[in-house]
Amino acid sequence: MIGEMSPREFLDRREAGEEMTLLDVREDWELKLAPVPTHVVHIPMGEISDRIAELDPKKETVVICRSGGRSTQVAEFLERQGFRKVFNLSGGILAWSRVIDPRIPQY
């Protein structure tokens, strides 16, 4: 079962030096409209099965989308592919905008 991680927990852990992959599964236009101001691996949901080799299954992976729906599906897919440390970023970029950085547009 995949875990949930809040935007605040993710940012706190990242700032504490923990290595985690933040996987953004939104479309290109969404990333341009509302970018996450931290390093991300961007693989749109529709490309994940073809590009899964770009991810390290041993590394903790936190998946983000707009609101949490697509990221939950991708996190579940990754878990079925053998990834063991997979989390959904609760509330997606909308929650990030509300909790962390209100300059990020809501869309």
Language model: regions and residue ranges:
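Rhodanese-like catalytic fold shared by cysteine-dependent sulfurtransferases
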Residues: 1-21, 28-60, 69-107
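Short, surface-exposed ligand- or partner-binding patches at beta-edge/loop junctions that are enriched
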Residues: 64-65
